Amino acid sequence: NINIECSSALDVDFNKSNLIISYYTIQFMHPSSRQYLFDKIYNSLEWGGGFIFFEKVRAPDARFQDIMTQVYNEFKVKQGYSAEEIMGKSKSLKGVMEPFSTQGNIDLAKRAGFSDIMSIFKNICFEGFLAIK
């Protein structure tokens, strides 16, 4: 059975599940709420169940973050976006989206109880993870 929810992830009453997917959602949650969500998801999964989550990620340091931002902005320009559109989007996300680093996301999963975690997708500053209970 598939259940699609449209509400705060913190308010969802997860049933026992074999698979839970989060697609670019957690990065918009307040950082102090994220561990609670990971814990809740882990506890809702059947043994051997998977949690797939995709997030925008920060680079491990400022130098690499500058490089990733530049590469991503160049990509957007090649896709036809104007400098004004790129800057407008960046400003609109300021204070609303707070991505963690790759390691920060892995650490959330580990603290929740996941021990088998791997990156399944990576493109510039976007990454997908699979965590298995």
Predicted features by range, described:
Residues 1-10:
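Conserved SAM-binding strand-loop segment of SAM-dependent methyltransferases
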Residues 10-20:
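A short acidic, Gly/Pro-enriched loop at the edge of an enzyme's catalytic core
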Residues 20-21, 109:
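Hydrophobic beta-strand segment of the Class I
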Residues 21-22, 52:
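A conserved beta-strand element that flanks and buttresses the S-adenosyl-L-methionine
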Residues 24-28, 55:
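Short catalytic micro-motifs in class I SAM-dependent methyltransferases
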Residues 35-48:
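A short glycine-rich, Lys/Arg-flanked "PGG" loop and its adjoining helix->strand segment in the class I
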Residues 106-133:
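Core SAM-dependent methyltransferase catalytic element
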